Amino acid sequence: MELLLGNELGATYPAAEPKREEPPKPFALPPPNADMRRVYAYLMKQRRVSREVVTHFARSGLLYEDAQYHNCIFVGTDEHGVPRHAHKRSTNSQGKSFKVNVEGSRPQHSFHHVGQDGLLYVFEAPIDLLSFLTLYPDRWQEHSYVALCGTGGQAMHWMLEQNTRLRDVVLCLDHDEPGQTAAKRIQEELQEA
């Protein structure tokens, strides 16, 4: 070993300090734009979501356009109607799309609609939810819907805890490997509950 080190035994270095946990950032909605032109254009022309569906969520304060980058902002609220979650989706129709939850968002409070009957539809993304409502517009407001903003089941479980009348769950996750894996996991969680 001395031959490799050139007759030096080397130096010892102190171990790195353990990484400190940073406190979670407080949740804050991105500032809204003065209008929603780009969001309406993107959702209606690019994604073919109906004007009625977009307008419903915009008037409810659950969908708007952010001022800085003109992203779609999908707002999730708690049981008191206080915003606790926001999902950003770029309105860029060319190039790579951008999707992210705003820092400090609570995953259990993602974008949702609470209806009066016992049926809950579960989606991966808010735009999947809006597209479904466009395809099946008849009395859609009677049912409940939640977008997981990913494949975690926290938002669905929160909806079921808050709304005890919800008895039937329809999983509408993507038909890809992550979506199908999540669907199986969530189905098992529901059967165990």
Language model features with spans:
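Short, small/acidic-rich helices and loops at N termini and domain boundaries
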Residues: 1-2, 56-62
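Active-site pocket-lining segments that scaffold enzyme catalytic pockets across diverse folds
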Residues: 34-38, 42-47, 51, 61-62, ...
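Acidic, metal-coordinating catalytic cores used for nucleic-acid/nucleotide bond scission
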Residues: 150-154, 173-184
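Short, aromatic/basic amphipathic alpha-helical patches
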Residues: 158-162, 181-192
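Acidic beta-strand-to-loop metal/phosphate-binding motif
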Residues: 122, 166-178
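Phosphate-handling DNA/RNA-contact segment within nucleic-acid enzymes
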Residues: 67-162
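Non-catalytic accessory segments of DNA primases and related replication-initiation nucleases
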Residues: 1-42, 177
